[in-house]
Amino acid sequence: MKKSGKSIQMALALLAAGTLLLNGCSAAKPAEKKSIRIGVTLYRGDDAFINNIRSSLEEKAKEYEQQTGIKVNLEIMDPKGNQNTQNSQVDRFLSLEYDAICVNMVDRSAASYVINKAMDVGTPVVFFNREPVEEDMKRWEHLYYVGEDARESAVLQGEILVDAYQENPGSLDLNEDGTVGYVMLEGERSHQDSLIRTEWSVQTMRDGDIPLEKLTGGSANWDRSQAAALMEQWIRQFGDAIEVV
């Protein structure tokens, strides 16, 4: 397994654009490759963040073509949040002998299906944004994961609030009751990055001696309308007691 901490858009695009293939994952030597075919399956195409990745990937594929003269045939498919549909898309890519596939898993625990199929035909797989379990990623040398460092981003979030509190406690303790009331709005309860960010953002604030009081929390599943609905509900319930979200 190889894991990258680079920006997910940039790293995914570079990996998907053939860097892996031209460094030993493909049977053909770099000089022999005139084009590469990459199949991409997203967990849900209507997700704003995933759409940004899609746009970045398409842009970087074009840049790669211009820089190397190697044609990048990129096919991006949307399983609309259905794991069975995603499995069928993976089957299609492999049956058509794509050079590599990039998979944003609908269900990260179902990665073994993708891995088994890819290993059977020797096609490298780049997982992104949703990391399969460690046991799956260790099964084959041509499995890769590209994603953010969730703990690092969570610690940075917490440190911003710690710095603000240390400079002026009243900037967070708005009602001056000696505690900082917060609500935790999560992306998706089963997403590993969401779980890590939740844990370490709070831990960093506690380590920085912010007197925290959790009022409530909930998951909006990366959906803006769900997040807005939760916040409206919490504001009605807790009002000015909410000092940090």
Please tell me what each predicted stretch does.
Residues 16, 20-21:
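Hydrophobic core
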Residues 6-14:
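Sec-dependent signal peptide recognition
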Residues 2-6, 25-245:
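A residue-level marker of the well-folded mature domains of exported/periplasmic proteins
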